[in-house]
């Protein structure tokens, strides 16, 4: 046994993705392990796998194997502890590449020549070095850009129900997202637990839109081991940090689906026989998610930014489920998809009332988008909330029994959903979104627009009221 690597012949046993060893001196948590095993079937060549030390006790250790353990014979395995932590070779040349969940080429091309090999378990940004998030990222989606603006350095999750087009929305944002002013921009996309149909659709969408050259894609498939799923977002963020803070790019990281990640975390925790917490998830899931989300931000004195848009599916459509509940505590808002809007054929089915971007004020307004951005958004919110209340009342008393003001609000709510929110797969600039909002508001007298300063109302040309109350789509 040398000073750099330690080799052990034979293991105690295997339980799922875990390999147990005893008599291993100086093992460290997170240490990379190489496993050379002989399958049970005779006559086959030995296979080599990799793993990571995840638990230590006085006389034994547990290793998470990154590949399939089926057919691995513990007694005939040779385990090498390398003394190294998991690292990823990163480079600007990763742009345009499709990688697996561990950062290995999945597009048939050779690995990129690394410029550095940082550890994938990076720390959150130092709070004393953080720069306040500012300036917005244009996604081309009106319900986000206009009503819940995404700011550079922010972490803004998308909460979806099972069966809603969250993956389609994620792909659309990857294809459409940009920053204003010609600054360098890139997207890092990480899919976790994706079935073949889904990840194939992602790649086809990126290629068709011509955005693959400024995108790095990490694909963890549904059939891949759960431990790989736990490393995929960390590999993606390690790559994004290099692009953002070494090369000065503004990087948007899209992670989907965080629920698959949490399910893998629970599966591995149960295999380690840990005491489960709420609904079987480990008690440290909050801390684990924080190690992912808190890597977003900006660094004082350095160009570039790292923005996160994680997508998660709420089990049983439950906002209080541990996954969305804990995610909401860590992140800075949420974009909520609605099953009711989806049933009505509205795409993207974003419900703007429970949605929120807590940092919108840092990326919207004078010098960032337009002077009228916040006032128009606030007025649209106010009328839409009242229109939703009227809709519930109309379901009881009937629309024919509503007053003129209530009918106007009801028509506004329909037009808002069908036109402003339900834009389909088209791209809208922030100017297009705000002009669409003004057309909706033109159906109300100026005295009713209490959220908009008078100077902005005087600066607007007169518009026909029919566009706001017709209930149809907005051009």
Swiss-Prot record:
PANTHER family in alphabetical order: V-TYPE PROTON ATPASE SUBUNIT B
GO molecular function, one term: ATP binding
Pfam families: ATP-synt_ab, ATP-synt_ab_N, ATP-synt_VA_C
One GO-annotated biological process of the protein: proton motive force-driven plasma membrane ATP synthesis
Source organism, top-level taxon: Bacteria
Keywords associated with the record: ATP synthesis, Hydrogen ion transport, Ion transport, Transport
UniProt protein name: V-type ATP synthase beta chain
Organism: Anaeromyxobacter dehalogenans (strain 2CP-C)
InterPro entries the record matches: ATP-synt_VA_C (IPR055190), ATPase_a/bsu_AS (IPR020003), ATPase_F1/V1/A1_a/bsu_N (IPR004100), ATPase_F1/V1/A1_a/bsu_nucl-bd (IPR000194), P-loop_NTPase (IPR027417), V-ATPase_su_B/beta (IPR022879)
């Amino acid at each position: 046994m040398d000073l750099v690597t330690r080799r052990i012949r034979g293991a105690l046993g295997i339980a799922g993705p875990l390999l147990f060893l005893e008599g291993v001196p100086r093992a460290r948590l997170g240490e990379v392990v190489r496993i050379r095993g002989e399958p049970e079937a005779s006559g086959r060549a030995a296979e080599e796998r990799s793993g990571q030390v995840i638990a230590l006790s006085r006389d034994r250790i547990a290793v998470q194997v990154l590949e399939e353990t089926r057919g691995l014979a513990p007694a005939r395995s040779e385990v090498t502890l390398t003394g190294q932590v998991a690292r990823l070779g990163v480079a600007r040349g990763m742009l345009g590449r499709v990688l697996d969940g561990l950062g290995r080429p999945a597009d048939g091309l050779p690995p990129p020549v690394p410029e550095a090999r940082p550890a994938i378990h990076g720390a959150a940004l130092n709070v004393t070095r953080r720069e306040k998030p500012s300036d917005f990222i244009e996604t081309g989606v009106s319900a986000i850009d206009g009503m819940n603006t995404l700011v550079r350095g922010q972490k803004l999750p998308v909460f979806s129900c099972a069966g809603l087009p969250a993956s389609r929305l994620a792909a659309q944002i990857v294809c459409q997202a940009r920053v204003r002013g010609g600054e360098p921009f890139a997207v890092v996309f990480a899919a976790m637990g994706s079935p073949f149909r889904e990840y194939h659709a992602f790649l086809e969408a990126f290629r068709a839109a011509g955005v693959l050259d400024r995108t790095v894609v990490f694909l963890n498939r549904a059939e891949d081991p759960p431990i790989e799923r736990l490393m995929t977002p960390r590999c993606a963020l390690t790559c994004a940090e290099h692009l953002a803070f070494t090369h000065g790019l503004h990087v948007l990281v899209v992670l989907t689906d965080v629920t698959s990640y949490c399910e893998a975390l629970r599966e591995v925790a149960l295999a380690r026989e840990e005491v489960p917490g709420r609904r079987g998830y480990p008690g440290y899931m909050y801390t684990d998610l924080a190690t992912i989300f808190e890597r977003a931000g900006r660094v004082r004195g350095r160009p570039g930014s790292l923005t996160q848009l994680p997508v998660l599916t709420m089990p049983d459509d439950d906002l209080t489920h541990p996954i969305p509940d804990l995610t909401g505590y860590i992140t800075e808002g949420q974009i909520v998809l609605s099953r009711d809007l989806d049933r009505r054929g509205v795409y993207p089915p974003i419900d703007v009332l429970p949605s929120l971007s807590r940092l919108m004020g840092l990326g919207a307004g004078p010098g960032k988008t337009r002077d009228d951005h916040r006032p128009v958004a606030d007025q649209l919110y106010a009328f839409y909330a009242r229109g939703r209340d009227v809709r519930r009342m109309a379901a009881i008393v009937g629309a024919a029994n509503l007053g003129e003001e209530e009918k106007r609000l009801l028509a506004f709510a329909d037009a808002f959903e069908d036109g402003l929110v339900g834009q389909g797969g088209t791209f809208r600039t922030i100017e297009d979104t705000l002009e669409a909002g003004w057309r909706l508001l033109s159906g109300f007298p100026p005295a009713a627009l209490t959220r908009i300063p008078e100077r902005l109302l005087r600066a607007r040309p007169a518009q026909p009221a029919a566009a706001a109350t017709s209930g149809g789509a907005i051009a």
